[in-house]
Amino acid sequence: MNRLKIGVLGAGHLGKIHLRCIQQANERFDLVGFFDADTANAAKIAGELNIKAFDSAESLIEAVEVIDIVTPTIHHFSLAKAAILRGRHVFIEKPLTHTVAEAEELLALTRQQGVKVQVGHVERFNPAFLSLGDISINPMFVEGHRLATFNPRGTDVSVILDLMIHDIDLVLHLVNSEVKDIHASGVAVISASPDIANARIEFENGCVANLTASRMSLKQMRKIRFFQRDAYLSLDFLEKNAQIIRLLDKNTEGGDLMEMDTARGKKWIDITMPEPLAVNAIQLELETFASSIVHNTTPKVTIEDGYRALKVAHQIIEVIGDTTLS
């Protein structure tokens, strides 16, 4: 595979992780350098990781084929637009942009320029999600909890754009239906925007997703559960594992399955815990993006996916605007 010349915009906490992952993926990428607006931090990272620090975002964009944007969300649009207009492929952290209008403009530019854009909805690459493999997922009810302890980093956006958007993306990816209605509420505890929020997303096909996100928790939790006809799937993104419980019409597994009577007749309960893949989710999403560029295939998480998740997130924020307690 051809090594792609890549540069990273932003060298904060997550940007530094991206730099390390790209260094590890040296068969896919040639890490040309990075830019960070904090010159003192840039000098420190350059020395620590032995990477060239560029003097401007523009000079870095000119020097590479691929740009990885890991800056605060408010800068996503201007940087991505500059890179796309120069014909560069772009990996951009979630959320895609600060506003829906910005996302729509980037979407149009991407199609116009014919470049690849992938959005960093990293849970698609979490070992827990990957372990489901080819299992058919057709959920009719989804319950998600994404709880984090308070950290000032990330409070530039609401908890919906910071945390809940991960689960919004997963739900939109798996539920093959349009959103019908949204009910939501939230509480601003410390930040200017909600620090805890709950959203009930109703789909045209009858599926309901009940999502809770908080950055005011005493303990971490990143779990989502899918309920569908004859199956229940539980994913723990923090522990990186999954549990699958299925109701089978016949004991075809040949094992000692529990038998039970249901409203639809006799069933057998099959409980499976797939072996999770030993992968680094961030490194895998970047390597997968490289593959889509080299082989001219559709990115795993498209700009359209990022736009849909952002649009629903902002709909939730609008609903909460009428109900927020602060």
Located regions from the model:
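N-terminal Rossmann-like dinucleotide-binding module
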Residues: 1-48, 171
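Beta-loop-alpha module in the N-terminal Rossmann-like domain of NAD(P)-dependent dehydrogenases
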Residues: 18, 49-107
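A short helix->loop->beta-strand "cap" motif at the edges of active sites that frequently abuts
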Residues: 51, 86-88, 113-116, 207
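C-terminal helix-rich "cap/oligomerization" subdomain common to oxidoreductases
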Residues: 59, 66-69, 288-326
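A contiguous active-site-proximal alpha/beta segment in oxidoreductase catalytic domains
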Residues: 97-154
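Mid-domain beta-loop-alpha active-site segment that forms a flexible
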Residues: 120-127, 150-179, 194-195, 306
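C-terminal glycine/acidic-rich active-site capping loop/insertion
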Residues: 122, 230-300, 326
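Contiguous beta-strand/loop segments that form the cofactor/metal-binding neighborhood of enzyme cores
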Residues: 168-243, 276-295
